[in-house]
Each structure stands twice: as structure tokens, then as C-alpha cells.
Amino acid sequence: LTLRGEGKVRFVGVSGVLPALHEQIDMGVFDVVQIPYSALQREHEDVITKASNAGIGIIVRGGVARGTPDDWEGRTYYMLPNEIMQNWWNSANLDDLLDGLSRIEFMLRFTLSHPGLDTTIVGTRSAEHLHDNITAAIRGPLPDNVVAEAKRRLTAAGATSA
């Protein structure tokens, strides 16, 4: 904070997870927070809202959960074994909500649907993947009714917000 006062630093941010994020937000010193969030990792949903309401910028990481069930073989995502994520996706019948979207587009647009989000970090493996991500982002958030239904199904499957 001394460096900010001296004009050497314009913005101060933190990348974090629960439970520390509540305290970090309450400190009132951060301009931006980077938080993991996706359809399959919703425990930070309320923290995003809290931080946004406090005027803190929100950067989401992991908004497509590092891929979709097809990509999860033998991987762990923020401490969640791939079997858990696959079970949530399948139990929630999220494929039924795709309506022509790819799973990646659905995940990205779900993430973009959170009203507190300012930006998201999305990885890419190829020029085609980058093009698909840009196209999905341009299409914007999912319709509210699709987000609500996805959340309802995911909650019933055990993937809940905090």
C-alpha cells in the first residue's frame, strides 16, 4: 500500500480461494481478485458477488474447468478428481442443455453469465480453439433460464455453490 501511495503501483490484486477470500475482500485494499469459477466449481459464486459489490474487479480462472468431460481423463481440477466432475456433468444431464453448443462453449458462456465477472482467463491449444473461444465470448452469456436450469441440475447432482 505504501507503493500505491507513492504512485509506484496503480492496482493491487490477489489470486485466492475460500476461505481466505472473505478476509481478503474485507481488508478493502485489493482492486482485483482472481478466483476459480465454472459451472462445475461454483463454491466461489457468492464471493464473486460480494467482491463485485465491494467494487473489486473480478478475474475468473478455470472458467471452462480445463476442458470438458472428454478432456478430464486422469486429471485433477483444483483438487477435484476428474471422476467427480464427470459424475456431476452426467448426473446433471448437462448435454441435454447444449442445444447445439459444444461443451466448451456451454462452459465458457455459463462462466460469462455471472453478473459480477469482469473478465476470464481461458487457455487455448490451437488457433481453432482460440477462434472457438472468441466466437463463444462474442455470443455472450447463456440465457438466464438455461443458467438457472443448469444450476438447479448441478445442485441436485451435488455440485453446489458455497
Functional labels for PLM-detected ranges:
Residues 1-39, 46, 56, 113:
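Glycine/proline-rich, positively charged
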Residues 27-32, 45-162:
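Structured C-terminal cap/extension of enzyme domains
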